[in-house]
């Protein structure tokens, strides 16, 4: 039986092209088309789709408002189509905060031309969310503030920013801890934390980073699969929500302790240097069959392994595909510890599963448990 899809967009051309693309895959069936958010709410209630594709800008009711109402009344996986502008990036992040599970850039030219990479991307993203119907997160879940954890080497930083409630990305009733470990810190020496993620990552990263205290004594390197126009807005949002400084990494910038660096979208990020000084190399890489992502977790993690050797806690969060497996393997070979997000709390279990199946990961946690275990391990 085919998965049922509801397509929501005020453009009849875009709706029809999305329908044609999705139905090229026999496992996908578009059962309805809505012109605005209000129609989407009504059709979700009557048609029971497995997944909804949602535009942001629409008359009568916009996509963000519709997402909030759908997630409050009848939760269903939603994938947003967003313009590649700063405004579009901010709107998409709002939609993800409201409960949407994923997003895709809205590129009319790719859709119109029926480009095979665009076709494959849309079909794969929609099918991944169809498979993740169970265990939907609600629009918002209040999260208790983390207990204070003191580090031996406080770092200087700007005055603490305002605190806000984080949005949970795990289903209600999910266990908080899945590792067989007792949770006792290993006592290992660390010099940095490295995180790789893709689908579902924005909410997962927000959950983890908002729990990190301002005196965290190590740099944090983050690779999130995102378009170039999105990462700056995402870094700014995380910076507002977090106690520590979060910023988009810049070429040649010196790495500082207590700062979280987000890899710029559409480019590659590596670190270079020695024990005295580490800096970033941000560069444009040609398209390659071997490198599917910009930024790429494997590339960043490999450079971290070269500079920091085994003094690293490597984390792979929710995401599609297997990016991060090779990089995590290189970190592991140097003596680093590798943890992954569990299947139940992952929006898509592809990246964590690839690392688990390769025998690289030592521990597996739900996203709700990650923050406390990271802080305990690295304290």
UniProtKB/Swiss-Prot annotation:
GO molecular function: phosphorelay response regulator activity; protein-glutamate methylesterase activity; protein-glutamine glutaminase activity
Name this polypeptide is given: Protein-glutamate methylesterase/protein-glutamine glutaminase
Record-listed 4-aspartylphosphate modification sites: 55
Cellular compartments annotated: Cytoplasm
NCBIfam families given in the database record: PRK00742.1 (NF001965)
UniProt record similarity statement: Belongs to the CheB family.
Its biological purpose: Involved in chemotaxis. Part of a chemotaxis signal transduction system that modulates chemotaxis in response to various stimuli. Catalyzes the demethylation of specific methylglutamate residues introduced into the chemoreceptors (methyl-accepting chemotaxis proteins or MCP) by CheR. Also mediates the irreversible deamidation of specific glutamine residues to glutamic acid.
Database matches in InterPro entries: CheB-like (IPR008248), CheB_C (IPR035909), CheY-like_superfamily (IPR011006), Sig_transdc_resp-reg_Me-estase (IPR000673), Sig_transdc_resp-reg_receiver (IPR001789)
Catalytic machinery residues: 198, 225, 323
Source species of the chain: Pseudoalteromonas atlantica (strain T6c / ATCC BAA-1087)
Domain notes: Contains a C-terminal catalytic domain, and an N-terminal region which modulates catalytic activity.
Catalytic activity: [protein]-L-glutamate 5-O-methyl ester + H2O = L-glutamyl-[protein] + methanol + H(+); L-glutaminyl-[protein] + H2O = L-glutamyl-[protein] + NH4(+)
Top-rank EC class of the record's enzyme: hydrolase
Pfam families, sorted: CheB_methylest, Response_reg
PROSITE patterns: CHEB, RESPONSE_REGULATORY
Cleaved signal peptide residues: none
EC nos: 3.1.1.61, 3.5.1.44
Domain of life, per lineage: Bacteria
Domain Response regulatory: 4-121
One annotated Gene Ontology cellular component of this protein: cytoplasm
Post-translational modification comment from the UniProt entry: Phosphorylated by CheA. Phosphorylation of the N-terminal regulatory domain activates the methylesterase activity.
